[in-house]
Every structure is written in structure tokens, then in C-alpha cells.
């Protein structure tokens, strides 16, 4: 029974990721015929999958059936406790304190992550367990929290990971605010840089690491642009630094003056060149040329 529910949940998650809900109604009908239990709800996180599908779908029949299922499962969550075992009774108060079916499903899946044996070492299904961010009535801070949550939703990774992107966005904003202590330009620039890096299509690993909890909200709030950069950009910066050091060393050691090269900028032939072995020994040396007239630099192999 659990395997069947997990299979359906995975299919729904893929539909949400691809934004293609074809066949969703059939899956919901399958779920309707499965006798659901509180244990199944908590171990499979099917509630989150159905709720994500409901939010994205524009098909009235799909949204209606999804709401109906969530409503029926809600009865399992806050139903009578006479038949529940002690473990389920412990879970009940935390679950039933939520205000909506969606929140109950998210809370149920979040609290259950630490107890699931098969998720002990699975980072891709990690749900952050940091203290909830304090609420705020500041309109600027609320807007920043919304924008951070939206950035975390880029690519729909949060669905597969099972993260609460809204709470995570609030935690990041709270950490930024606690450090800066106001909502001035420094605060706004800090938030803006987090959003830009989270939405960077060339740096999806940063977003995934934040969603998985590998990068905690308070650490992410303090990271520099260099620390948030993609591996590709870090490598590029490393190479540029090496190049700058090499050129600086060349300038100090000098070179050989020649009129064999024509400057592409000023067309003069008053140049100085230096040859350096920048690659393996069996490769041609790299020639660095500096125009003594205008300072233009170029290189060739």
C-alpha cells in the first residue's frame, strides 16, 4: 500500500516540476480508492504532493478532487484520539494546531522527516529544522520575505526536496535583519544579492544546498558574492587572478624590445615581448607583448 502511494507521489512531483498535469486526475482517483491512514500520510508526504498539484493546476476537476482528498485526510489528523497509539498521540497536538489543511500537511511531513529511517542519510529529502522565524508587520520586511521565497521556488527544486520555501525565506530575511538591524539600502542590497544568486540558472547547486539545509539560513545571509558564485565563475576568477599575477611578474622582470610586432591599437611597432611556458613542456610557449607607445597588451601561442 505504501509503495503505491509513494509511486503516485513521485509522479505528481514530476508533474509539478515539469508543469504538466496530464494524467493528474487519474492519479487522484487512484488515491481516492486507497484507504488512507495517518501513518501513510506521514511516511509518504502525499499531502504535500497533492497540495502542490492543486496549487499549480488550472483544471477545476483536478483542484476540486485534490481539495476533497485533503479535506478527508484532515479528519485523520484532528480526529478522535481514542484509537491512536502513544506515538500518534504525541504527534497530534503539533499537527492539529495548524490553521489550514495545507499547513497541516506541511507540518506533518516536516515533523516526520527526522523519524523516517530511510531519510536519515538522504539529503535530497532534508527539511530544515531551524527555529521558526518571528513574525513581523513591517511591510518592507514582509515583501523581502515573499521575494526570497519566490527565488527559492525557482526550478521547482523545493517540491522534490520537500522544503518549506516560505519559512526558509523568512529565516534568511530574519538573519539579514538581525545583523543589519534596519531596512536601509544595505539591507535591501543584501536581500537583492541573495535573490539574484538563488535565481541564477548557472548556479542551481547554491539554491539546492540552501533548500536541503547544507547551507543554513544564517550562513547564507552572511555569504559574500565570491562564496555564492558558481563553480564556473570561481574558476574564471581564479584564472584571471593567475593571469594578472603573471602579467605583473612580467612587468617587473621586463622583456625584449622589438619592432617585429605591430600594435593593433596604435599601429606602432615599438613593442616589448616575453615568452613564458604556460602549458606543458611539449606545448608552444606563450608570447606576451606590450606596446611601449600606448600600453596595449596581447598574447599568442
UniProtKB/Swiss-Prot annotation:
ZnF bounds (TFIIS-type): 259-299
GO biological process terms, semicolon-separated: erythrocyte differentiation; positive regulation of DNA-templated transcription; positive regulation of transcription by RNA polymerase II; transcription elongation by RNA polymerase II
SUPFAM superfamilies the record matches: Conserved domain common to transcription factors TFIIS, elongin A, CRSP70 (SSF47676), Elongation factor TFIIS domain 2 (SSF46942), Zinc beta-ribbon (SSF57783)
CDD domains per UniProt: TFIIS_I (cd00183), Zn-ribbon_TFIIS (cd13749)
One Pfam family hit: TFIIS_M
InterPro entries for the chain: TF_IIS-typ, TFIIS/CRSP70_N_sub, TFIIS/LEDGF_dom_sf, TFIIS_cen_dom, TFIIS_cen_dom_sf, TFIIS_N, TFSII, Znf_TFIIS
Domain TFIIS N-terminal: 3-80
UniProt KW Ribosomal protein keyword: no
Stretch list, region Disordered: 76-139
Listed name of the protein: Transcription elongation factor A protein 1
Amino acid at each position: 500500500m505504501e509503495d503505491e502511494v509513494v509511486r503516485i507521489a513521485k509522479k505528481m512531483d514530476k508533474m509539478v516540476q515539469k508543469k504538466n498535469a496530464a494524467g493528474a486526475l487519474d492519479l487522484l482517483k487512484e488515491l481516492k480508492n486507497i484507504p488512507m491512514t495517518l501513518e501513510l500520510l506521514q511516511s509518504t508526504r502525499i499531502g504535500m504532493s497533492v497540495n502542490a498539484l492543486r496549487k499549480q493546476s488550472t483544471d477545476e476537476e483536478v483542484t476540486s478532487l485534490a481539495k476533497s482528498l485533503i479535506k478527508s485526510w484532515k479528519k485523520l489528523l484532528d480526529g478522535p484520539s481514542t484509537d491512536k497509539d502513544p506515538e500518534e498521540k504525541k504527534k497530534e497536538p503539533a499537527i492539529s494546531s495548524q490553521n489550514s489543511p495545507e499547513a497541516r500537511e506541511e507540518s506533518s511531513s516536516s515533523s516526520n522527516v527526522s523519524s523516517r529511517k530511510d531519510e536519515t542519510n538522504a539529503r535530497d529529502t532534508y527539511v530544515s529544522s531551524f527555529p521558526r522565524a518571528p513574525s513581523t508587520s513591517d511591510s518592507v520586511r514582509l515583501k523581502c520575505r515573499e521575494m526570497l521565497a519566490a527565488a527559492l521556488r525557482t526550478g521547482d527544486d523545493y517540491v522534490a526536496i520537500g522544503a518549506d520555501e516560505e519559512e526558509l525565506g523568512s529565516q534568511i530575511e530574519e538573519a539579514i535583519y538581525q545583523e543589519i538591524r534596519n531596512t536601509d539600502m544595505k539591507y535591501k542590497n543584501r536581500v537583492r544579492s541573495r535573490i539574484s544568486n538563488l535565481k541564477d540558472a548557472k548556479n542551481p547547486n547554491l539554491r539546492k544546498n540552501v533548500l536541503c539545509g547544507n547551507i543554513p539560513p544564517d550562513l547564507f545571509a552572511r555569504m559574500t558574492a565570491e562564496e555564492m558564485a558558481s563553480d564556473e565563475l570561481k574558476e574564471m576568477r581564479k584564472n584571471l587572478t593567475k593571469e594578472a599575477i603573471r602579467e605583473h611578474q612580467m612587468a617587473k622582470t621586463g622583456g625584449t624590445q622589438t619592432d617585429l610586432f605591430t600594435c593593433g591599437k596604435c599601429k606602432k611597432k615599438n613593442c616589448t615581448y616575453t615568452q613564458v611556458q604556460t602549458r606543458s613542456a611539449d606545448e608552444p610557449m606563450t608570447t606576451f607583448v606590450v606596446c611601449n607607445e600606448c600600453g596595449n597588451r596581447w598574447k599568442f601561442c
